[in-house]
Amino acid sequence: MIKPMLAQKVNTKPIDWTNKVFVQPKLDGVRCIFTKDGAYSRAGNEFKNVAHIKEDLIDFFRKYPDAILDGELYNHALKDNFEKIISLVKKQKPTDQDAREASNDVQYHVYDLVNEDQDYESRYNWLLRYVPIASSMTVIKNTLVESYDEAQMLHKVHLAQGYEGSILRLNKPYELKRSYNLQKFKDFSDTEAFIVGYEAGKGKFEGLIGKFIMCDDDGNEFGCPIGKGY
């Protein structure tokens, strides 16, 4: 299983602005690693309802069978309907209708190449050169910035355009962990976690799920009541 590089929060470690720093919009989509064998989630689960994207990548992986693409399943036209993207890509036995909907609504937005030997600018230029142009996919646009203030101004533009925030990419190698080579601007605090269990409800909630047990990337477990942002 390939663990993608995860972002640290910006401002938790100084950035050397004398080196190249790139900013891109932060997508509120579903993280997806694409290889010649298929499309996979952060947890290594295969996405079964992305046949239209696989079709557009057949020739690419025939030429570059060792390439590993990192991106998100997303559609900016559905930025306010994230649940629809989730519903479509999580289907394990998609019907013909599911496949048609996914073909219309789910795109692959590529933003990195899993390669621990190249800096980000080299990886990004490779993506621009070799990832096919298709209606089902795109390579995310990056902007080179020279200061925190410039990055913050661009972040405000991304928010005004309806994006979740912004991502800063340092011109350093890809790391298979949470890394300061990748940092995120957001206007609210959150954490990323997986459901690992649940506790039964009590009283009037007996027979129902009371709360989910979550586990974050550092191995910390905590409870999350239903409807509280899981």
Question: What is the predicted function of each stretch?
Answer:
Residues 73-75, 110-115, 141-144, 170-172, ...:
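Short, structured patches in soluble enzyme cores that scaffold and shape functional sites
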Residues 3, 20, 66-68, 107, ...:
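A residue-level signal for beta-strand positions that form part of recognition/binding surfaces
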Residues 1, 142-190:
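Amphipathic alpha-helical
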Residues 13-135:
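Covalent nucleotidyltransferase
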